[in-house]
């Protein structure tokens, strides 16, 4: 909320003409909206690029695990933050919080979600940047909104979404992104790489320098 306020406070295309109360209310609404809702209280085409980029971070993070919103989910990000904290501490303890250990399998799953989601969004964004004549940040916003099933668009300054101005190839990519995001990372990944075969042996540990 504070980030939106600080960036858009004097932007005449968004918050500039509002009084202080309305500015605060709109910044709060935006900070919630980009994580789940898909509504507009202002014309999003007027947002500065820094606000649009911050919005993509909110959309990628998403909402809580029990909700219907898209994104990687708050708990996924939290698990990775806790893991990084313990790695930086070089602790010999397993990652834990609130006196509960976080299973390695759960950490691996969280890392896979973040890696796959980030790689997919980056690949599709670069693909659309090369095929559609629009700025990088705005295309990134459209891709993340589609993949995370948020339902917002930066708009064209009128009544149309930016994605509606893409050619047929660009529109198809956005549609595929929405389907991929709704299926979920693991279901979509399973369609691509297939299910692993069951094995009854274990390889020796490899010592790799990082």
Predicted segments, located by residue:
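Membrane-proximal intracellular helices of multi-pass ion channels
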Residues: 1-210
């Amino acid at each position: 909320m504070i980030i939106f306020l600080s960036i858009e406070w004097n932007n005449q295309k968004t918050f500039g003409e509002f009084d202080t109360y309305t500015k605060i209310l709109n910044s709060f609404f935006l900070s919630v909206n980009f994580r789940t809702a898909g509504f507009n209280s202002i014309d999003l085409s007027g947002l500065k690029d820094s606000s649009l980029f911050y919005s993509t971070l909110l959309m990628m993070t998403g909402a809580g695990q029990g909700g219907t919103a898209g994104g990687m989910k708050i708990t996924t990000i939290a698990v990775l933050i806790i893991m990084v904290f313990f790695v930086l501490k070089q602790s010999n303890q397993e990652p834990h919080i609130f006196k509960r250990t976080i299973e390695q399998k759960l950490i691996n799953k969280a890392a896979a979600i973040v890696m796959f989601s980030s790689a997919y969004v980056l690949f599709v964004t670069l693909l659309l940047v090369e095929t559609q004549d629009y700025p990088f940040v705005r295309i990134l916003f459209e891709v993340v909104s589609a993949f995370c099933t948020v339902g917002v668009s930066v708009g064209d300054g009128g009544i149309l979404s930016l994605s509606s101005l893409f050619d047929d190839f660009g529109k198809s990519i956005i549609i595929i992104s929405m389907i991929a995001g709704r299926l979920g990372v693991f279901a979509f990944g399973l369609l691509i790489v297939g299910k692993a075969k069951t094995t009854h042996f274990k390889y020796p540990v490899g010592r790799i320098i990082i």
